[in-house]
């Protein structure tokens, strides 16, 4: 309910690190509210976007069994994105071996190297952190991810044409750091200011 862009059942399974059968079972009886394509490589979509608002609003959704805690859902997705990227991202992810290769030269192979759930994670993980109200600190999971995978993440963003979003995301992270004098803050300043 809080995805920032639609994903397929396969991609959700990978992003959430859940068996595909669990996702299938969870959406099985939701045809009235979800467009569930026969081709499970196509994205799930809500028939009525207002239903999302209903599930996220405590006053409108009278049944706590259906109520979705939006902040908690964003926190979970943020860390699911980080876990997926930590597992998947690496140097020279598209196997080009030569710096300066154009995206047009790699073409459709970028989709093979960066499947939809990885592209989703790369683009939206910081927004999920922000919407989840997560405060950052030295040596937390976010700091450790960036220390190891910052360049891998930026490389992936460049392959999918989203590098400017990455630079903006890095700059915005600074306001979520708890302590004003921290190595995490210094790391982000060095990253953005050079």
PLM regions with names:
Residues 1-194:
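Leucine/isoleucine-rich amphipathic helices and adjacent mixed helix/strand linkers
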């Amino acid at each position: 309910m809080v995805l920032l862009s639609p994903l397929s059942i396969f991609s959700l399974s990978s992003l959430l690190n859940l068996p595909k059968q669990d996702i299938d079972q969870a959406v099985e009886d939701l045809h009235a509210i979800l467009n569930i394509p026969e081709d499970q490589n196509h994205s799930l979509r809500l028939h009525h976007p207002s239903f999302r608002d209903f599930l996220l609003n405590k006053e409108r959704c009278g049944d706590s069994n259906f109520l979705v805690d939006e902040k908690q859902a964003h926190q979970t997705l943020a860390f699911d994105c980080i876990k997926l990227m930590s597992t998947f991202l690496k140097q020279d992810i598209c196997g080009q071996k030569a710096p300066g290769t154009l995206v047009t030269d790699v073409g459709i192979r970028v989709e093979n190297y960066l499947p939809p759930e990885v592209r989703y994670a790369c683009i939206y993980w910081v927004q999920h952190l922000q919407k989840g109200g997560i405060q950052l600190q030295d040596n937390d999971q976010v700091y450790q991810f960036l220390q190891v995978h910052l360049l891998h993440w930026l490389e992936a963003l460049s392959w999918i044409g989203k590098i400017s979003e990455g630079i903006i995301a890095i700059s915005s992270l600074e306001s979520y750091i708890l302590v004003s004098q921290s190595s995490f803050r210094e790391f982000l300043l060095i990253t953005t200011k050079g």
